[in-house]
Swiss-Prot record:
Location of the protein in the cell: Cytoplasm
Lineage start: Bacteria, Pseudomonadati, Chlamydiota, Chlamydiia, Chlamydiales
Assembly and oligomerization: Homodimer.
Residues noted as binding substrate in the record, renumbered to the chain: R22, Q23, V24, G25, R26, D71, Y140, S195, H310
Gene name for this UniProt entry: hemE
GO molecular function, one term: uroporphyrinogen decarboxylase activity
EC class of the enzyme, as a word: lyase
Function according to Swiss-Prot or TrEMBL: Catalyzes the decarboxylation of four acetate groups of uroporphyrinogen-III to yield coproporphyrinogen-III.
Protein known as: Uroporphyrinogen decarboxylase
Amino acid sequence: MAGFYDIISPSNQHRPPVWLLRQVGRYMPQYQELKTNRPLKELFLDTESIIEATLLGPSLLGVDAAIVFTDILSILEGFAIEYRFAPGPEIIYSPHQPFVFTEDPFSTFSFLIEAIQKLTKRLTVPLIAFAASPFTLASYLIEGGASKDCSKTIAFLYQYPDKFEALLNEIIKGTAIYLQLQVQAGASAVQLFESSSLRLPPSLFSKYVVSPNAKLIRLIKQRENPPVSLFCRCFYQEFLSLYATGADTLHPDYHVELSEIYRQLGDPGSIQGNFDPALLLLPQDLLIAHLETYLAPLKQQSHYIFNLGHGILPQTPLENVQAVVKCLTSISTS
């Protein structure tokens, strides 16, 4: 079974493979044109829009992988949970209401399955399916959308630990089915996003991040056994505990120094990340100088995948992103 790095890495290229978090988005004029006068949710649920947007990554940037154009909330279609973008995500949900995944996921997600089937026929690079990790999706549900402090979630898991555990378990089961469908349709690999984890105290990290992600990854791999990359917002000590999840590739955010990982661990396995997306706002000459400094200790490391420490910011110049990818695809490790 090929690992995440092996699937993403271009053949006969002695350089780090590259793709980017939120590589298709508001910073692209072509994407803005696609979404003109259309609700964002409509784009995520429309087969042809998914196809058109997904293709923008490889066609405009020249990255080594495409990632399915959808949202971490799209899975809520399978739980019959009402949500919208206004413009940010808003979820209509009470953590005390029933939360069970659909018995007919093929019908519920037919729009997505069809998009992936068509994309795999058109793409010349691998296609990555993705979903939120359990704690992150649970926090979105309890907070009613994105939250910087996850205060409602933290209070809920302390007050109702059994209910929170039950919610995580339903998320794990539903997410595994959701991702298996996409792999069966033709996706080559899976990316998980644990974006809310930075808010958890270290004493709860293992219980609510490591253990649930380990369960989810085991379930995802039961059928097609796709390689899985895990993005997680955390600090160094918490990052080390992520090896217990069984993820093929670990992707820390910019709070973790990759050079420190290699210095401490020697051979840490497949690592992805974690260039600060804020640097993409710099004048291009300064951006490339920072990029070259960042890459110096990394580009000769085996199984290293270049990516960002978080998603591309909406105000990022497209030409800066293109310059970063061009720099990556032209370097030599010899």
